[in-house]
Swiss-Prot record:
Belongs to the methyltransferase superfamily. It comes from the Eukaryota. CDD domains: AdoMet_MTases (cd02440). GO terms for biological process: methylation. Pfam families: Methyltransf_25. Its EC number is 2.1.1.-. Pathway: Secondary metabolite biosynthesis. GO terms for molecular function: methyltransferase activity. This is Methyltransferase ungE'. The gene is ungE'. Keywords: Methyltransferase, S-adenosyl-L-methionine, Transferase.
């Protein structure tokens, strides 16, 4: 081996170090270190560990990982902002989604690659961590387009259902802005909606917001759906696919929510894998943040990710009409569709 020098790390060392740092960014956000450095400017490592009941050597390791990629800088035992802190903070939930929420999937890549293992419930992710990350992803990337669509509605919202509601934060924001409205959140992840229900009660929405555990793709008519006039669905529309199933799901939503005047459907779309010659396709040297993890992760789970063109090709058969499309280019290539009954 060569001697230790101050030369830049070779490419594979950068890849290795970045893999550790990616986990560290998600963890640092969850334990509050990123916010502490951002807000306080200087954080004593030992004091932070003691105040938050964290193992001191592990926190020192966490800080070292962040320092290697210049998210923070370490001055003796004091952590200060590094050159990449602002960008890391802006994208923190993407790292959390990848490494904490989906870590159980990626750490078993060698297992899920084998067809002999791809039966039944062959992969694991952390639904509560996914919900936590998706709340911030929605806030950072989808909210501007979502609220533009909400502000453009030409009717007063009375009853809203969020399909794949996760933490329920979107519904609570809607209820804040529309005090006359009530809401229902539907999600297949029981742990996520248990947290959401407790949060809703704590924030005073207990009599206006309820949560139902269930698969949004298989939802059946209930009396409480009769007057729902707004449907929202973010970061789970790809679960409707492949095409025939997506059309069937859209038709089902059309029947189950007969009074819905708008369906706001937002999701990231496929731009990397199996997109030869596609108008929005990217190549290896231009892959944006999130795209690789999002597309590879869903490929391993056996979930089909549609392109924008494929989405636009199912609305009519599904019983909906697209009245407006909001593109979001800061998160892979994402979109918010405004749909109405055809």
């Amino acid at each position: 081996m060569g001697s230790w020098t101050s030369d830049p790390a070779p490419p594979m060392a950068e890849v290795f170090n970045s893999a550790v740092a990616a986990v560290a960014i998600g963890a640092a956000w969850e334990v509050g270190l990123l916010d502490a450095v951002k807000d306080q400017k200087k954080v004593d490592v030992f004091q932070f560990a003691a105040e938050n009941d964290l193992d001191r050597p592990s926190v020192q390791g966490l800080v070292a990982a962040l320092a290697v990629v210049q998210v923070v800088a370490l001055e003796q035992n004091t952590v200060v902002a590094g050159r990449q802190l602002e960008e890391a903070y802006r994208t923190k939930s993407l790292f959390h989604w990848l490494c904490l929420g989906s870590g159980g999937l990626f750490s078993r890549m060698q297992y899920v690659l084998r067809n002999e293992h791809r039966t039944g419930d062959f992969h694991r992710r952390d639904p509560a961590a996914i919900a936590h990350a998706c709340h911030d992803i929605n806030k950072q990337y989808f909210d501007p387009a979502f609220w533009a669509a909400m502000d453009g509605l030409d009717y007063p919202v009375q009853s809203v259902v969020d399909l794949g509601c996760g933490s329920g934060q979107r519904l609570m924001q809607i209820l804040d802005r529309h005090p006359q409205a009530s809401a229902i959140g539907i999600d297949v992840a029981g742990p996520a909606i248990q947290v959401a229900a407790r949060d809703a009660v704590a924030r005073g929405f207990g009599n206006r917001l309820v949560f139902r555990e269930g698969d949004a793709r298989e939802v059946s008519y209930r009396d409480e759906f009769e007057h729902v006039d707004l449907l929202t669905c973010f970061m789970m529309g790809h679960d409707f696919w492949p095409r025939d199933k997506c059309i069937a799901t859209l038709q089902r939503l059309r029947r189950v929510f007969p009074a819905a005047r708008r369906l706001l459907l937002g999701d990231a779309t496929r731009i990397l894998l199996d997109t030869p010659g596609g108008q929005q396709a990217v190549r290896n040297g231009t892959v944006p943040i999130f795209t690789l993890g999002f597309e590879v992760g869903h490929a391993m789970m056996g979930v089909y990710l549609p392109t924008i063109d494929e989405w636009e090709g199912v609305f009519a058969e599904g019983g909906w009409r697209c009245v407006k499309k909001h593109l979001i280019e800061s998160l892979s290539l994402s979109v918010v569709f405004e749909l109405e009954h055809a």
